[in-house]
A protein has these predicted regions:
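ATP-dependent adenylate-handling active sites, centered on carboxylate activation for C-N bond formation
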Residues: 113, 191, 202-389, 404-461, ...
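Acidic, carboxylate-rich catalytic segments that either coordinate divalent cations
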Residues: 487-496
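Core structural elements
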Residues: 186, 395-406
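Cysteine-centered catalytic environments shared across enzyme families
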Residues: 1-235, 241, 245-291
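Short alpha-helical scaffolding segments that buttress acidic/His motifs in well-ordered protein cores
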Residues: 159-163, 393-400, 430
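Structural motif
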Residues: 91, 95-97, 150-155, 383-394, ...
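Charge-dense polyanion-binding interfaces
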Residues: 144, 149-152, 161-163, 441-469
Length: 496
């Protein structure tokens, strides 16, 4: 595989004093230059840069991306907070910034601290070079000349099978010396160290799971509704759990949404097409089936490059499919809902299950590598004071979602992706559920079922993630025959 610098950098950014050679290249490719305080930013449309001020009209930082305020909607231009910045930075950021949903990066520029924070799931991923003290959306913006190839860790890339379906966990990237910031950690711009800022104490278990499901439903619906007030919105509709929750939360304004389903020649896609079409017809939803479009090799090479050579799998060649929606402003998906599905738990796990770097790496389902084990060990040292079930949830959120799910944030730049299950309020709601509400059984769980029931109970009359008849008996066998490596990965997760 020959590495190339991306031709198109739409939706990307760089923060800090870039080397002159890098800055000149990015400006030539269309970057916009702006300083907030004394910190330089380079951004490529449609990436939005919003100046943040406190109640005293003092500039305290900037937001990148598409943040959504629960009261005023999509944030643009300038964001004015209703309180002054105080000395308790951690509490201030948690209350004022993590009240936002949407997809964003927050750069704090205060006298007492200069830091970078991701949103609750790191849906706008970023990487950084501690030596050059620069931060960017992907690695290529931090490199010059032959460094793209010379600093590429090809051995680790191949060992982790990134091209097929692997990824770099624990803050690793495909390039030596460049690290990825994980969700729930901030980057200190003074010394380029990272520190956990959430959670700082265990999330308490809710005494009323149904009421907490209502909170989750409201949070999802509020975010989607605000998007409809700001632009045109396409929403994924599948046979899955998360898109059903999004639809249930959007019942009152579903007529303002355009629902889409990918019509691909796969077993999972056939379930999606059948159930999505039935739901749309029954409830009068605007719905379209979009064809699976394959990239040629040149487009696949460009896509790998735009993502910093940190992501692989079928999407390398399937990514042009989303181009069917480029006339829309936003695409709403269901990523983040897995946090409420006990994804890394095993049936015999308890809050006291012994965990170490080796067992966490096995849960990730990837080959055992010294680099990965060391990275996970460092992460585990920063994740003390939580029971084992919470630690496994944080591993999924931080090591997988932040390093895999959103390492691909910049491959497709129109429309803007927003995942309304991602917010601090939503994640607190999910993590506060009793274990029995989160464990999956028959491809769903009580939290999902109750959330859908509260919003639109008739949607539960259509099966979740299955046909609901004899065809389900053969689905796993068919998948195992077509993709045997997935069986091995599942075994590593279960018994590794």
């Amino acid at each position: 595989m020959e590495l190339i610098y991306p031709r198109v950098l739409d939706g990307q950014f760089l923060i800090g004093d870039a080397l002159a050679e890098i800055q000149a290249r990015l400006l030539e490719q269309g970057a916009k230059s702006k300083c907030v305080g004394d910190l330089p930013f380079l951004t490529f449309d449609p990436m939005q840069l919003v100046v943040v001020k406190d109640s005293s009209n003092t500039v305290i930082g900037a937001l990148l991306g598409t943040p959504v305020d629960s009261e005023t909607g999509v944030v643009s231009g300038e964001y004015r907070l209703s309180v002054p910045l105080n000395d308790d930075i951690d509490e201030f950021v948690e209350k004022q910034i993590y009240s936002l949903s949407g997809s964003f990066v927050f750069v704090l520029l205060a006298d007492q601290a200069r830091r970078i924070y991701l949103d609750a799931c790191g849906s706008l991923s970023l990487v950084y070079d501690p030596e050059r003290r620069t931060v960017a959306s992907t690695s290529s913006l931090l490199l010059k000349g032959n460094e793209l190839s010379d600093r590429f860790d090809r051995e680790l890339y191949d060992f982790l099978r990134v091209e097929r379906d692997g990824w770099f966990p624990g803050g690793l990237t495909g390039h030596i010396g460049i690290k990825r910031l994980m969700p729930n950690f901030y980057l200190d711009l003074e010394d380029f160290s990272t520190h956990r800022h959430w959670p700082i104490e265990p999330v308490g278990e809710t005494s009323d799971p149904s009421d907490t499901c209502q909170t989750l439903l409201n949070e999802i619906g509020n975010t989607v509704r605000h998007l409809t007030e700001h632009g045109t919105v396409s929403v994924a509709l599948t046979a899955g759990n998360e898109t059903r929750m999004i639809l249930a939360a959007s019942k009152d304004f579903a007529n303002k949404l355009n629902f889409v389903t990918v019509n691909a020649d796969t077993h999972a896609a056939s379930i999606d097409v059948i159930h999505a079409s039935d739901i749309a017809k029954r409830f009068g939803l605007k719905h379209e089936l979009i064809p699976l479009v394959k990239a040629d090799n040149a487009a696949a090479d460009e896509w790998r490059s735009r993502n910093g050579y940190c992501f692989g799998g079928p999407h390398i060649y399937n990514h042009p499919t989303i181009a069917a929606l480029k006339a829309r402003d936003y695409f709403v998906g269901g990523l983040g809902g897995e946090i409420g599905r006990a994804f890394f738990w095993r049936p015999d796990d308890t809050r006291e299950t012994k965990l170490d770097a080796g067992t966490i790496t096995a849960r990730l389902g990837m080959p055992i590598s010294k680099a990965v084990t060391e990275a996970v060990s460092i992460w585990l040292d920063q994740t003390q004071g939580f029971d084992s079930l919470t630690t496994l949830d944080l591993a999924y959120l931080e090591l997988r979602m932040g390093c895999w799910g959103f390492a691909v944030s910049y491959g497709d730049y129109t429309p803007i992706d927003i995942h309304p299950l991602i917010s601090r309020r939503s994640f607190v709601a999910m993590l506060s559920m009793p274990p029995e509400w989160r464990v999956m059984k028959n491809l769903t769980n009580p939290m999902i079922l109750e959330t859908v029931r509260l919003g639109w109970p008739e949607l539960l009359e259509t099966p979740l993630n299955k046909f609901g008849d004899h065809r389900d008996r053969f689905s796993r066998v068919r998948r195992a025959i077509k993709q045997p490596h997935l069986v091995l990965k599942r075994l590593r997760k279960r018994f590794g």
